[in-house]
Amino acid sequence: MRDYEFKEIEKKWQERWSKDNIFKTENQVEGKENYYVLSMLPYPSGKLHVGHARNYTIGDVISRYKRMKGYNVLQPMGWDSFGLPAENAAIQNGTHPAIWTKSNIENMRRQLKLMGFSYDWEREIASYTPEYYKWNQWLFKRMYEKGLIYKKKSLVNWCPDCQTVLANEQVEDGMCWRHSKTHVIQKELEQWFFKITDYADELLEGHEEIKDGWPEKVLTMQKNWIGKSFGTELKLKVVETGEDLPIFTTRIDTIYGVSYAVVAPEHPIVEKILKDNPSIKDKVTEMKNTDIIERGAEGREKNGIDSGWHIENPVNKEIVPLWIADYVLMNYGTGAVMGVPAHDERDFVFAGKYNLPVKQVITSKKSDEKVQLPYIEEGVMINSGEFNGLSSKDALVKIAEYVEEKGYGKRTYKYRLKDWGISRQRYWGTPIPALYCEKCGEVLEKDENLPVLLPDDIEFSGNGNPLETSNKFKEATCPCCGGKARRDTDTMDTFVDSSWYFLRYCDPKNLNLPFSKEIVDKWTPVDQYIGGVEHAVMHLLYARFFHKVLRDLGLLSSNEPFKRLLTQGMVLGPSYYSEKENKYLLQKAAIIKGDKAYSQSGEELQVKVEKMSKSKNNGVDPEEMLDKYGADTTRLFIMFAAPPEKELEWNENGLAGAYRFLTRVWRLVFENSELVKNANDEIDYNKLSKEDKTLLIKLNQTIKKVTDAIENNYHFNTAIAANMELINEVQTYVSSSMNSEQAAKILGYTLKKIIIMLSPFVPHFCDEIWEELGEKGYLFNEKWPEYDEKMLSSDETTIAVQVNGKVRGSFEIAKDSEQALVEKTALKLPNVAKHLEGMNVVKIIVIPNKIVNIVVKPQ
């Protein structure tokens, strides 16, 4: 018998698949429905990590399964290949980003092929190529023409390490998302913005269309990020100048409790205040220089400056002080808020710190209940003029109406979502196709001159904007008047690249348009998208925005980009921390003894199971696993260890277990292959033995269980476990029933169905066995098995027989047999009869189709 030589087998089938180009996908196949499976495209860092392997294995299993279910499946792959790491490599190593990126792509493509993924490589894209980023520029122009792009001076998030602007979504706890120890600062720059806020309502309303296919957690994260708040915009009067100071509040019911007002240090009125009160200028400057993310953080102490100015409350005409405070941000609402310390926890703390008045205007509905401030529950209005006695819920409406009637303000809503700033002061991105001409002003490059190419004469020093160092790039000709012009030296945020890439896969060779509407409408929305939940408010929100814009531009028809979204769980691994060395050690440097680990010097290490990361030294190189166990074993372990949406704890013992299972199946097939090959599949169902029936029922139950597990919730681990149980049943059958031509037919029939069901998980292994069993072609093209309803359960049942509650035997009998026959059969069992000797039968209790309990006592 041949050994399971996985390296030889996997190489053989990868070469055959490639030679026959079996994964090539046509845009339409007669009689087949299109199905688009897509995993988020990777950044080409140079090496696959285990997270990649998990994501792409999930996608490949779905893709192969859907093909076998009769769909015309598109599963492409490409590279999100612009971005800072390539530029940083150029700075550190003197390697041009294009060379570094191309080399990394080649290695990662090789690794993906080693995993046996069924990608249509003819559709491969890479966002760093002019063939791709030309269309970023073309789409920029179309959005500009539609009024969805503008440029303005703006306070932006600036990473001192990246030397570039970050979107709000790229700032995490005040730190750069790429440099976790770098504080983001505020800087005022001219920036290009996409008007994503124009689509805020539609982005919220669109959740209704995708709610059945997307995780609720992702929809909630997007809803909170968009942050639509209903309230009232109220015009407070600045006493010193008579001008209006608009504020936005969701709690107009507390307007009578205002004891101060607050503005952000960046608010335009602050400049006027400083002219009148220059003594506070240094404090204001210090406040403005504080990290804006930190300023808005929950739990941080709030700091304020008394401006010396006052405002008049239009509702009760009270004069209250105007303060400047760091917790008020210009990028939300109007940059000014009212202070109601009796009914807001933050305001209460601020008022206490600066000894500001506290005025209660809502009390408990229970008149005898003593209220502790701040009181933030619903209640009854007090100290609120004509609104006294109303419930605070009713007052919210009545006071808003009153404010509108009097002309003091209006009911409106605000968003937390801000327009998407896309300008980046780096080289390795899509050049913005804008120019500045003294005569014509701001103009965009002509379509026929696209793409605006990245220049080669760049100095990668790590300081400032690299494109500013290229005169060849900056000096240009105005496309309108032919005069001298200067190119915009910013590049686009790389999230632009990934906001529409899934559409380019549909029509990747199109030279005239980013894609054909006719072709894209055949494939989109993407049927199944797979990626991490960390992309909820960046990539996934931007892609939804882009899709709606492209629909409105007439470039496609669907409203949403992704019908279903699967967010796979993180991959965890053991980490080993040395307090003595103050660092994480590699697993191979740790000495494992039972559930403890020690360093080479004998120090006991802190062992945790954590998300795999470079900083924790607990990552696993998938290629090492491929070399040791093979792609199929690695794929099987990944899919068996946990449901896809749950965390997966990497465990080499689990890999070894998956390998043992495959070798067991291998032996089972090869030990019986000659028998199976010589038998046809024509089973005589009228001549089935008890063992034949048992196996065929188990087979049909397994087909149903596997199909349901994949179709209903992608619980691939359940599907694999069901096949493992069936293999156990087959081994029992082989050891007891291989004594007829019928048995050989049933064995062959069952093994082939198992191999088909395992093939999405372990494709090389299964194609090899398929060939060994005398079958032609690729399993990729086989039809997924269907179960026979009539063979899901036996027409017989097993009855357990108890004597005084203890099991003494069992027998099989037709279901729903008459009770007299059941009792008679039970009493005849030899071991039961033995335990009835010398006993009187008191009564016999029969639970139909399950148990017979014979109650006895001594004679």
From Swiss-Prot:
Motif ('HIGH' region): 42-52
UniProt GO cellular component terms: cytosol
'KMSKS' region, short sequence motif: residues: 611-615
Keywords for the protein's UniProt record, in alphabetical order: Aminoacyl-tRNA synthetase, ATP-binding, Cytoplasm, Ligase, Nucleotide-binding, Protein biosynthesis
Pfam families, sorted: Anticodon_1 (PF08264), tRNA-synt_1 (PF00133), tRNA-synt_1_2 (PF13603), tRNA-synt_1g (PF09334)
EC number(s) on file: 6.1.1.4
Gene3D superfamilies: HUPs (3.40.50.620), Isoleucyl-tRNA Synthetase, Domain 1 (1.10.730.10)
PROSITE patterns, alphabetized: AA_TRNA_LIGASE_I
Compartments reported by the entry: Cytoplasm
Binding positions (ATP): 614
Domain of life: Bacteria
Alphabetical list of InterPro entries matching this protein: aa-tRNA-synth_I_CS, aa-tRNA-synth_Ia, Leu-tRNA-ligase, Leu_tRNA-synth_edit, M/V/L/I-tRNA-synth_anticd-bd, Methionyl/Leucyl_tRNA_Synth, Rossmann-like_a/b/a_fold, tRNAsynth_Ia_anticodon-bd
Molecular function (Gene Ontology), one example: leucine-tRNA ligase activity
Zinc-finger in keyword set: no
Catalytic activity: tRNA(Leu) + L-leucine + ATP = L-leucyl-tRNA(Leu) + AMP + diphosphate
GO biological process, one term: leucyl-tRNA aminoacylation
CDD domains, A to Z: Anticodon_Ia_Leu_BEm, LeuRS_core
Signal peptide: none
Keyword presence, Cell membrane: no
Classification via SUPFAM superfamilies: Anticodon-binding domain of a subclass of class I aminoacyl-tRNA synthetases (SSF47323), Nucleotidylyl transferase (SSF52374), ValRS/IleRS/LeuRS editing domain (SSF50677)
PANTHER family: LEUCINE--TRNA LIGASE, MITOCHONDRIAL, LEUCYL-TRNA SYNTHETASE
Family: Belongs to the class-I aminoacyl-tRNA synthetase family.
Protein name: Leucine--tRNA ligase
Encoding gene per record: leuS
